[in-house]
Amino acid sequence: MPKKTVAIIGYGALGNILASALRQTLSEDYQVSGIWTRHIQRDMERIRQDGFRPYGSFEALLADKPDYAVEIASVEAVRMYGETLLRAGISLVVTSVGALAEDELRETLAQSAQANGTRVYVTSGAVGGFDVLQTVALMGNARGCIENVKAPESLQGAPYLEGKSLPLDRQQTVFRGTAREAIAGFPKNVNVAVASALASVGVDAMQVVIDSCPGKQDNLHRITVENDGVRAVIEVASRPDPGNPRSSVMTAWSVVALLRNLASPIEFF
């Protein structure tokens, strides 16, 4: 069978990890067709040096008609490019899942995918267990909560914390609210909360707690979804990416796992 082609949108620390991982581990099934960033003139030489093809424009990506486009850039990238990609017959892999907390955007992407025979794939990112979360929620009367514990530097720049200082000598809860409220206040920090919510109880029912913990070396995510008969707890601790303390290297590898699953005759759910 011919290889499937994958375009990558975004080439920060995680985009670089993803492109290299696809080349190293899935080269029999996939080929990276090219890479596009909003700052392509700045990034073009680095992309070439790494052995990949830079797209000179977003239109060049569309004209190339890859099988999949992987967004590994930002919520804004999902807003800007998602619908256009789907209408062009290109399936979309989303890592900045926080974008899907916007009901109108999520519905637009769903309708575009359905009308054009494409799909939107939501990656598990820095967590996982979406199959369990879906199952528990489908059984009915489900409740959900996700606790996030991160070092203060991982939370820097969040709109919710503008004008606020975080203590450097003790752990402190800095946010309590719904997943929808969390992604508005922490757009680069809680994609996992939105993904877990969409897979289970919804963004308005999923409760989110964010703690700042000085000296913490990893990002801790503890997801609890329960109903009257089942209580599921998923806990993942992962070290942040050295190049971007707000993100986990696991996010890039979750895309690799998704694509491997899509290429396999046996799928794990």
Ranges and model annotations:
Residues 97-118:
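Rossmann-fold NAD(P)-binding glycine/threonine-rich loop
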Residues 9, 17, 121, 126-269:
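Active-site-lining helix/loop region of Rossmann-like oxidoreductase modules
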Residues 14:
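Hydrophobic/small residue at the entry helix of a nucleotide-binding pocket
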Residues 25-47:
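NAD(P)-binding Rossmann-fold cofactor-contacting core
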Residues 56-87, 99-103:
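Beta-loop-alpha module in the N-terminal Rossmann-like domain of NAD(P)-dependent dehydrogenases
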Residues 52, 88-90, 115-118:
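A short helix->loop->beta-strand "cap" motif at the edges of active sites that frequently abuts
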Residues 2-6:
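Extreme N-terminal starter segment of soluble prokaryotic enzymes
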Residues 71, 94, 120-124:
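General beta-strand structural signal in soluble alpha/beta enzymes
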